[in-house]
Amino acid sequence: MNAKSLHNVMKRKLKQAGDKFPELKTLHAHEIKAKDAYPCVKYHILESILSKDVTISYIVVDLHYTEGRLLKDKNILYNFAAKILISKLITQNDEGKTVNILFDNKTTKIASKNSLREYIIADIVYEKGLDVNINFEYKDSDAGDAFIIQAADYVANGLYANYEYNNNIYKNLVKEKINVVQYISCLCGSR
């Protein structure tokens, strides 16, 4: 994926959306959040994202069947889900390479950032035995240069609409770019 190309298209499309719908620009300092965007804006931005060389991988956790203590500490649940997805994405094909992972700062608390990094490195490098250098970067989605995080937010929001509201218009749009989907229907622990 050419990150610069995705960055540029998001920057351009969000500016155009803000110019056409100025009320959307006033909600957040440097972004138009997907949850706040009008459906036509969201659809157009998703089309623009998908016009780039991207693949989409995601994980779905059914919270109705997730143990209560995992729901109480969302960082542990997030770290666990992130590790599962990332371990499916980083494979032997990546040996000898550097993999860059960009996380939305709002999804990880300060205290859990190092544990997330260490948790993933322990799994990939030590448990799977892969010779991979992993760089982690955390960026606030409201930062002036967080267009890649914002692109991921638009994709996630579109997929969320499918699972939460049975609205598949956005999922149908992205389905050709889907690489890995991981469903976790039960995080129940041992009883």
What is each stretch, according to the model?
Residues M1-R191:
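Phosphate-ester processing/binding pockets and catalytic centers
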